[in-house]
């Protein structure tokens, strides 16, 4: 494109702006703020003055900053009008060069800028001088400039070129009155001062037009009626529109001479051209008019009466007022202001057209179009930024604004000054904003095109990757149907080869598509969106590849677990086949040898196996898992039956040779027995001590080791059930168990009945709005309960018919699954609310259709009733069992479990009602208890609701709401690790004391319970937690010592001795409260091994004193003989519910495998969610599966 310069040179600022437009947005406002304010100039010389007519062209352009850029050729006739074709710096761009084709027609606009006089849709945008067809266009801005551009432009620019060629270069139409500029007027008339607008306002706020009757310009030849009316219209257009609407007050100064006739004729024409333009004419002077012009309201006034119409402060000094006015300063201000406004308006129109043009550029549909559109956009932006208006504004715009804002009283005191400057600032800021918008939009457009162009250069490589994904990658990851374990194992070899190639393909594709980071599909063209789709496909393939790799690794791990389980089962079957015809003594020895070499698989083995099978998501693999578990279970049961058969009493003395070792006399405190009992069928009584001791030794020789191996424990004499020989007692046990099994079957049928008939009702289209999506809240975890009882618990109850007391182990083994009843109880109030609001009415039709006399609410109450039934039946079994036997202890533990779950649901509801708590209660372990106490601290007494967690003791203040719902305001909490307990405090049996280590003696809390039972339960639970913490701390210290190289040998006594630590007790009454430790609690030495807090009674011989250090005997904690009721009798493998996540019921804790693992680390608690697998003796397959969740 040919540059609009005369000699080929260009402004450095213009060049910099044009070449740096893609990376920096030129802000004219910033440029103006950085410029030094222009030096104060005399008001009569604000800038290069306009030369009079007849001056040479060189004189006109001398001193103009743009004189070397734009020079208009003289007209052919060299008339005065042609001489006015060249102007000074303030108006050269307005009168001289018009916009070129691209600058004025960058997009199909409704109108375009032209050089024709009066052709403009925007006020003040016309860039013409005096009318006449002789005005010429600079060659650099002619339409022919586009013809010389070698760049092939797209359709928008072609349309621009066509429109430009059809645009006329001039027009003789008159300019609208509101678009007149100073350059459109006769300079001699404007500069003469015959008509001025000094900024005066009359008393009614009208603008005052001052006409000097004594001005010689009224007699000049240039003062034609046309020029006069143009001058008056121009002056009228300067005030604000609201002031123009009031009309002008024309003040005629006729004090020296009478006004000429042309003055009043001009006013009459002004009134005709713009009705209401002249409100009144005030004639100041003593001259009397012979004829009053028509259409004008004329009033002759003496100079003294003028103040009644115009205030003194508004009158110019020439009329005796106080308003300073200099016509030359006013002229300079108007010329510079109008030049700035013209360039801003032209630049705004240009930039708006360019923005629309960039938006109108078509999207590239073919790869070859990207380069053409990119070059077209760059040329478009280059031409826009090379436009003379932007160049002038960049070079002089800031200086012009600075000059216009100089404090010149002759100009700034006029009310029209602020209006003009506000308009100038607005237009200047608009140019700045439009340029910023255009630059950002164009840069983003060009960057997107360049990005697509870069990716097109890599098209071949990306196409190869895409083809590989479609033909090789994705088909290789697909699985035909539901895979089996063998199929997954066979796929490992081919997958390793695929994995290496796939990683290379993904890496190469990500390297190619790296420039797409941060781009969205809406910001790119269709070719770019295609590359984005390829990147998304690569990301998805990488994820699928990683999942496939993990899936095959899980399959391999699962195969190893399968192989270990099957190997264990096959070895057991082999031993059983060999012992088929052997004598009982040989059977016992061989079984002992077998369990020594092949200990039972730990529960974690089957948990991991089921987790992997569930993660693989194949029913066939899960079926294989069930088959392996069933085979192991059958083997374990066969071995157990073989052991029981071999333990039947032979004739006296016949098994003496089988005794491995003699057992010493029983200690004063006999330890608890294993979870299973081998002497239940012996039928011996306490009157047969010799035989009993002999048989105990035999059992000790045949007892199974732990899952991880280890030495065999010593046996202890057991006491057979006293009522085992009583037929009536056995009959009673059988009857109670039969009732339990029968009611269990009815309970399972009721749960299935509810699910089959009422669950589908919520899928009906007419379900009430309040019940939509409320299945989990209405029914709770009823489906999980049904699965547990139907698939597991009912079967185990039925298997206990041979020995009814074993029912207790079924409860204890599934303590985690019974935790679902606490969640069900917690959700029950919400379920009842839904039933009362919507359920009774909605489900009534279904009840009538079924012909059932029980409604849904009755069936939803059955789980709560069933737990109460369990408690009664277990109580009956305990009464029938009688005596302090192992089975009796297990039954009591099961009772405690049931009672705890019944209470725990209410405890969870109370925990949810705690408000303002800044402690995460989910991280504090199981909620054990919550009750209301009277708390005394010093002299202060208050009522507090206290919550006991495994890791925290929380105090809250009960608040009773108006609706009867209690809430609890959080007050304080203490870590259990810092707590100490004094079980008896004061004279009352209802009080106990809580104190803290490393604190002052007065920092204690005395808690008074409402009943003795509550007090005993709380002290027992707290004691249990403190014992467990003491044991845990001891183990941690031992582990730390081993890791530091201290105590690298096992701590074991070679032989029993009176000097051994375990035979000593330390009884020391502390004399100072500050030195008490957390072990100073009144608790049985082995009570920490109980399964449920507050469940077991104190053993005989327990210390009963308060704040006394008893025999901790921590070295016996891991003695297998003390683990008692940890080992279940029958294995139970949790199927689909083992590791499936349960949907939380309104924030209820879900029973997942992870929760079971966490809770299983705490073997405690009457509300414990599980048992510590490390504390389980691992007697048989699944014997520790009581901590597996069933949900």
Swiss-Prot record:
GO BP terms: namely: axon guidance; regulation of small GTPase mediated signal transduction
Phosphoserine: modified positions: 64
* Phosphoprotein among keywords: yes
Bias regions of kind Polar residues — which residues? Answer: 111-120
* Free-text tissue specificity from the UniProt record: Expressed in kidney, Leydig cells in the testis, epithelial cells in the prostate gland and Langerhans islet in the pancreas. Isoform 1 and isoform 3 are strongly expressed in Purkinje cells and to a lower extent in other neurons (at protein level). Widely expressed at low levels. More strongly expressed in testis and pancreas.
Gene3D superfamilies for the chain? Dbl homology (DH) domain, Pleckstrin-homology domain (PH domain)/Phosphotyrosine-binding domain (PTB)
Q: Which CDD domains match?
A: PH_puratrophin-1 (cd13242), RhoGEF (cd00160)
- List where Low complexity composition bias occurs: 1159-1176
Q: What domain of life? A: Eukaryota
Q: Which GO terms describe its molecular function?
A: guanyl-nucleotide exchange factor activity
Stretch list, region Disordered? 1-152, 707-728, 1150-1176
Keywords, ordered alphabetically:
Guanine-nucleotide releasing factor, Phosphoprotein
Occurrences of domain DH (ranges): 732-908
- Give one Pfam family: RhoGEF
Q: Which GO terms describe its cellular component?
A: cytoplasm; cytosol; extrinsic component of membrane; plasma membrane
Occurrences of domain PH (ranges):
920-1027
Q: Which SUPFAM superfamilies match?
A: CRAL/TRIO domain (SSF52087), DBL homology domain (DH-domain) (SSF48065), PH domain-like (SSF50729)
Q: Which PROSITE patterns match?
A: DH_2 (PS50010), PH_DOMAIN (PS50003)
Q: Could you tell me what this protein does? A: Possible role in intracellular signaling and cytoskeleton dynamics at the Golgi.
Protein name, per record = Puratrophin-1
> What gene, per UniProt, encodes this protein?
PLEKHG4
